[in-house]
Amino acid sequence: MDSLTPTAPETLAAAVVTTLAVDADPQAREASIFYWERGQGHRKAVVEAAGNTGDAETGRLAAELRDRPADPRLHHALTRRLVLAAERGPTPALTTLFDRAWQAEANSRLGYHLGRSYTATGQASLTSGELRGRAGGPRLAEGDTPEVLVVIPFRDRGSGQRLRNLLACLQALRDQTAPRGFYRVMVVETDERPRRREVIEPYTDHYLFAHKPGTFNKSWAVNVGVVNAPGSAGCVCILDADVLADRDFIARNAARFRRPGVMGHLSYRDMWCLDETSTSRAIDERLWQGVGRAETDGLRAFVLRRPPGCCVWVRTSAFHRINGMDERFEGWGGEDNDFAYRMDINSAFDHYDDQLLHMYHPSSAVLREDGELVNAHIPALSWGPSDVPIGDPDRFVSQASAVPNG
C-alpha cells in the first residue's frame, strides 16, 4: 500500500463493505444515478476481489451482503471478518481487496452511512395523511417584515411521497429557534394544475401556483418564487422539498451573513440520502418526538459527496446580480452546478459542514444514452444578465391549451 492509503483495518474493511453495498443496493443508484454510473468500474473490481479472498466465510458474507445490502447484521459481520483477517496477517488476496476497495472509495462521490442502532425493522412508513393531521404551527403575524425568504420549488404527480416530504419539511421549518417573524416560507408548485394546494397552504406562509406542463423546471420555479414573493427579504434560501431541517437551521444560516463580504453559501458538504425506514424514523423524531435534530445512529443513508444544490443560501442582491437560476434547464441535472459555479465566480461563496438529511422518494432522474446528464448540452456559465425578465409565472401558460389537465 502507498502512503496515500490508510492502514487501519477498520477503515479498509469499511471501504470494502461500503463499496459492495453501494454496488448492490438499488437505492444507491436512486440517490444519484450520475455518481453511481461513474463509479462502476472501481466497484466491479472490488466485487471480483471479494469473491477471491480464499476465505470461504468472507466470500459467503460478501455474497449475502450483495443479496441483502440493507441488512445491518451482514454489514457488521463482514466488517468484523475482514478486520480479524487483517489482524492475523493479510494475505496477498486480502491486500488486493483492500487496495481495490480504497481506490473505489477514493474515486467515488457516493458513500454510505449505517448507524450503530439502525435495524431496518420496527418503523412503519409515514404517509402524507399522517402529516396532514398535525397542526400547522405558528404563522407570520400581520405587520411582520421577514429578513429571510425560503423558496421551495415543488411538484408531485405520484403517490404522495414527495408531498409527505414537503409537509415534513414545512413543519420542521415552523419549529425553529429563529423568531417566527424573521423568515417567510414560500412554496412554488409548478404543474398542469394546482394538485396539492389545499394540503400545502396551511403549512406555508405563501403559496404560488405556476402553470408548467411537461418536465419539471426547478430553475424557473425558484426564480418565480424569488421574483414574486411578497416583502423584500435580504437573503434567500433555495431549499429542496425533501430536506428535513434541524431546529437551528434558519438562525444558524442567517447568522453567517454577518461576516463581511459573504454573499452566499452551501450549508453542507455531504448530503445524506435516507432510505425509507430512516426517513420515517427521522420525521418521527424531529416532529412527533420534538427533537431538534434527528439522531444519526439510527439512520441509514447513501452519502452524496460535495453535491452542489438542495440547500443554497444567497443574498437577494447576489441572486439578481447573476440573473438567478438558468431557466433553460429542464428535467433533472446540472442546474444546481451551474448556479453554484456562477455564485462562486461572482461573489464570496462559502461552504459549511452542517448535517443535511434528504428524505426518500423514488428517483425520476435519467441519463442520456451517452451517460451524460440530460442538460449536458447547455454551456456552463452561459447564463447572465439579460433584458428578458426572469421568474415570469405565466411563461408556460400558452401551453395550457395543448396539454389536458391530469
Describe the residue ranges of each PLM region.
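C-terminal catalytic/acceptor-binding lobe
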Residues: 2-129, 162, 306, 316-317, ...
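Cell-envelope/extracellular polymer assembly enzymes that use nucleotide-activated donors
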Residues: 147-151, 338
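A conserved acidic beta->alpha catalytic loop
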Residues: 158, 179, 188-198, 243
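Short, acidic, metal-binding catalytic loop of nucleotide-sugar glycosyltransferases
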Residues: 168-182
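Conserved donor nucleotide-binding strand/loop of the catalytic core
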Residues: 201-217, 228
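Active-site nucleotide-sugar/metal-binding loop of Leloir-type enzymes
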Residues: 220-235
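Short beta-strand-to-loop acidic/aromatic patch adjacent to the donor-nucleotide binding site
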Residues: 232-244
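Conserved catalytic core of nucleotide-sugar-dependent glycosyltransferases
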Residues: 246-327
